[in-house]
């Protein structure tokens, strides 16, 4: 249901049904709020991290991109349901971001270090801080990520938010380009110091912590297989982006430790990928290629500063024009780029749902991931019974207690 301040003022929350507005109608309500923000906020704020007109434009672009593909259910979402008017809105609002003071940070690794909080890459982020710097007793910590440090590296490292083998495989390259069709044919992973024919997109080493490699670039904190809590269940990989370097220490002054890493809502690259997506669906493939190659060039430039130890294992190239001669191939490039660039940043499922390919992608993932082996250790057996049902699982069901509490008020979501 749509519940705003009027519902609270009128004490009418328990009288509001969940089918009062359509999918498009609900988006319209959200868009109206962001349009108000867009019209009244300044383009620049004096303090880093404060919301501004450009952040509102990014939100508007994301709303229109969500609407442009359909209503979220697979049968009525995807390439056969494109709304070009909404796609043009995406271009209009991302144009505001593209022509602002925001830009790509020069090195991909810097994006996820505390020293670069509120940089030109950060269009909007949830702000966190260190108690030693913010004049508070304990610090305004990022509790959402406190459990994601790898096991044995942090006092709060409980090894949550684990990358999959499928994701690691997706970073494979051949002649510098993604292996679209056969990336997942066999399990592969790099080992520090071992160079072979298989090369990798450099962003792998900024995104996924792996045994034998320095943890977040620091050789004195090299990961081993002992840094995984339950490898026979969840494997040996760990997520790197959302945690600081170990030498920086934990930054919450209390019995439980947490981090002062900001939580990105929009970074510049994310918005530019949204822009490229809209360009492809509007037939402007050359403009999309330019954006995607700019992002890949930044990745290519992000080896020497932080991951020189993996230099011989990295290979990345720009897309030639031949990859952007038709929408189908261009889409494949865009979607792959979005997966690699935004990996472990929490938006993957919503990308798949928006494109109308969640069921095929996730069910194939479940089938392959249950066969994982790392150095003789099998894991991920919990995927054996996993299944995603199209035109049902795109949205959660209305909880039974809500249906029971106010009989007849709510309509259960489709196929539950």
Region spans (language model):
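Nucleotide-sugar donor phosphate/pyrophosphate-binding loop at the beta->alpha transition
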Residues: 145-147
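Active-site core of glycosidic bond-cleaving carbohydrate-active enzymes
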Residues: 125, 152-164
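Acidic/polar-rich alpha-helix caps and helix-coil junctions
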Residues: 1-142, 152, 175-416
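Residue-level signal for threonine
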Residues: 52, 161-170, 399
